[in-house]
Regions:
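Residues in the helix-turn-helix
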Residues: 125, 129
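Residues within the helices of the helix-turn-helix
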Residues: 95-105
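Residue-level signal for the short linker/turn that defines the boundary of a DNA-recognition helix
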Residues: 92-95, 121
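Short helix-to-turn junction characteristic of helix-turn-helix DNA-binding domains
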Residues: 87-91
């Protein structure tokens, strides 16, 4: 089975893309290290304007869950993890990620018209590779993330009866 056959359906892609966009905004705000659980902290955050544009983000529980899944799955490939973070957390376009990888790419064996030889990959090759890496990353993350959301236990708020 080749990488080209590993595709998600449109519904699956939309589901994981939506969650990863929310997670990326959550990671970008720096909440990975600090947990905002008190009402005062949430109120203060809403009163003080932030210095960066806000985008919709997930809550802390969802963010921590997604981070655990992404870390456990993407630790295999650091390049794919970097591309995933650049795309979802920092909001970089596929083109800007590709142009960065084109700038830092070192020559490697590539098939050319004259045969196989050492060459630096073109920007189009880098764009194709970044697109394939993102698609493969989403495919690899879909099943563990869906399973994690289904298996987690929701903590219901306990109401005290006075």
């Amino acid at each position: 089975m080749s990488v080209h056959e590993l595709n998600l359906t449109k519904d699956q892609h939309d589901w994981i893309n939506g969650w990863l966009e929310l997670w990326g905004a959550w990671v970008y705000t720096g909440r990975l290290e600090k947990r905002m659980s008190s009402m005062i902290a949430q109120w203060m955050e809403s009163v003080e304007p932030s210095g960066y544009p806000t985008r919709p983000m997930c809550n802390d529980d969802d963010g921590m869950l997604i981070s655990q899944v992404v870390d456990s799955v993407m630790c295999i490939d650091k390049k794919a993890f970097g591309i995933l973070l650049s795309y979802y957390s920092h909001g970089s376009s596929k083109y800007s990620i590709s142009s960065y990888y084109h700038k830092v790419a070192s020559p490697r064996k590539m098939m050319r018209r004259g045969g196989e030889r050492m060459a630096k990959p073109s920007l189009a090759t880098c764009r194709r590779e970044v697109d394939e890496i993102l698609k493969a990353s989403l495919f690899v993350l879909y099943t563990p993330l869906e399973r994690a959301f289904k298996m987690r236990k929701r903590v219901d708020k306990i109401k005290r009866v006075a």
